[in-house]
Amino acid sequence: MSKFGELINFEVPILLDFFGDLDESSKSMHPVLRDVAAALGDRGKVIKINVDLNSELSEALRIKDLPTLMIYKGGEMVWRQSGEQDAKILINLINDFV
């Protein structure tokens, strides 16, 4: 979990995608997140976290539905939503925190 603290402690916004390999909604978010990362460039980061490989972290953050997306800035969670999201909405949200 100390690695998680390092992961989210950036001044640029960090979009975390908690996903499952077998979850269809998670799979459909892959191209969306690729578009978000491309649009952000160095103004933000997109990080995918597999809940099956990170069960302790998933439990600590109470991840119940997939995908679950979170935006962190400066070590603080500033936004959280479960379910599929649109790339334009995510880009606009992240730009609000740049």
Predicted regions and their residues:
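Non-catalytic, surface beta->alpha helical segment in thiol-disulfide oxidoreductase systems
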Residues: 73-98
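Short hydrophobic/charged patches on amphipathic alpha-helices used for structural packing
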Residues: 4-5, 55-58
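Local sequence-structure signature of Cys/Sec-based thiol-disulfide redox active-site neighborhoods
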Residues: 3-36
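Thiol-based oxidoreductase modules, predominantly thioredoxin-like and allied folds used
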Residues: 18-20, 34-37, 41-56
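Structural micro-motif
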Residues: 61-70
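Chalcogenol-based redox active-site neighborhoods
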Residues: 28, 60-61, 92
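Structural motif corresponding to alpha-helix initiation and N-cap regions
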Residues: 1, 51-54, 87
